[in-house]
From Swiss-Prot:
GO terms for cellular component: chloroplast envelope; plasma membrane. GO terms for molecular function: ATP binding; protein serine kinase activity; protein serine/threonine kinase activity. The modification Phosphoserine is found at residue 235. Its EC number is 2.7.11.1. This is Probable serine/threonine-protein kinase PBL22. ATP binds at residues 81-89, 103. The active site is at 201 (proton acceptor). A lipid is attached at residue 3 (S-palmitoyl cysteine). It is found in: Cell membrane. May be involved in plant defense signaling.
Length: 381
């Protein structure tokens, strides 16, 4: 039996046999029995064509509650960098000097023991440049804490919505770069792992950013193993965030990897429009982003009405048209008609590269015009 050695059923702690867990932790048992890609492996999870044996907490360190209290100055309110139904996230500094983000789960919150276990299992097995790195965890009494690498720029929603007066809006290129990073993270879960993993909680709040605006997907407590063998979907209780859930999943609990594609389409719409998936402060008819955008998505002549005014027209119209066309495909009500994530990655890599070229040309033109104006001003004297 493989288990978290720090967890003990004789106290308030948990002891976990990963071979009998449900949800994503079923990966341990499912992956040892099934290899739908035909390699014949029976000893673990296929990641990038190689077998990974699930070892919960494998690369993650077990922290004491005292260590994490010291790192956050006793969970001082001034150290809080995020809050939600799950609890609070604190900025902390470990004894080694490493700056980290520490998520303290609320015992009465939305994220319970099961989701905690799923997240530790998942981030201990799966590693990718676009997935957040789990440094460690703590299970002391009723306390459940997760320790992640610190992302200095916060989440995507911090840079799209309710900006401070002195805050610079994201450029078009940066938005497309973020779309590429998020898509690559999803591609890893869908295509590089066997069986596939359905993220189930893709939203702007879970897209973290470093100083270069490179993406790290976070919060995997709701992740689910995708359908295997001849199964077309997974039937499960509806979880996730309202406004991002695919219609077939929200209505019937039928979950597939295409459910993530729909959620990605909502994020794309947020990137393009600068609007929230749900914003009850908007007038009636504009509160639900997808419903508001539908008429514009179907008419290329109205694409411009979707664009965030803060972009001030500083983007290639051709790149905008491409991005909106793909967004519309991702938001198709019919799951089977949504694109594969691999195709989405290729498309947005192209859009991002073209957007960068456009931005570079625009900057060069601006510099040339500025130099010419300076020369003309000097000559006039």
């Amino acid at each position: 039996m493989r288990c978290f050695s720090c967890l003990n059923t004789q106290t308030n702690d948990m002891r976990i046999n990963i071979d009998t867990l449900s949800d994503l932790t079923d990966y341990a048992s499912v992956a040892t029995k099934i290899d739908p890609r035909g390699t014949g492996s029976k000893s673990g999870i296929l990641v990038n064509g190689k077998v990974n044996s699930p070892k919960p907490g494998g690369g993650a360190r077990s922290f004491t509650f005292k260590e994490l209290a010291a790192a956050t100055k006793n969970f001082r309110e001034g150290n809080i960098i995020g809050k939600g139904g799950f609890g609070s996230v604190y900025k902390g500094r470990l004894d080694s000097g490493q700056v980290v983000a520490i998520k303290q789960l609320n015992p009465d919150g939305h994220q319970g023991n099961q989701e905690f276990i799923v997240e530790v299992c998942m981030l201990s097995v799966f590693h990718h440049p676009n997935l957040v790195t789990l440094i460690g965890y703590c299970t002391s009494g009723a306390q459940r804490l997760l320790v992640y690498e610190y992302m200095p720029m916060g989440s995507l929603e911090d840079h799209l919505f309710d900006l401070e007066p002195d805050q610079t809006p994201l450029s078009w290129y940066t938005r497309m770069k973020i779309a590429v990073g998020a898509a690559r993270g999803i591609e890893y879960l869908h295509c590089k792992i066997s069986p596939s993993v359905i993220y189930r909680d893709l939203k702007s709040a879970n897209i973290l950013l470093d100083k270069e605006f490179s993406v790290k997907l976070s919060d995997f407590g709701l992740a689910k193993v995708g359908p295997v063998g001849n199964r077309t979907h997974v039937s499960t209780r509806v979880m996730g965030t309202y406004g991002y859930c695919a219609p077939e999943y929200a209505m019937s609990g039928r979950l597939t990897i295409k459910s993530d594609i729909y959620s990605f389409g909502v994020v794309l719409l947020e990137l393009i429009s600068g609007r929230k998936a749900i914003d009850l402060s908007k007038p009636n008819g504009e509160q639900y982003l997808v419903a508001w955008a539908r008429p514009y998505l179907k008419d290329p002549k109205k694409f411009g009405l979707l664009v965030d005014p803060l972009l001030r027209g500083k983007f290639s119209k051709r790149c905008l048209n491409y991005a909106i066309s793909i967004t519309e495909m991702c938001l198709n009500d019919e799951a089977n008609h949504r694109p594969k994530i691999g195709d989405v990655v290729v498309a947005f890599e192209y859009i991002a590269s073209q957007s960068k070229s456009y931005e570079d040309r625009r900057t060069a033109r601006k510099s040339t015009d500025s130099n010419r104006l300076r020369r003309e001003t000097k000559q006039s004297y």
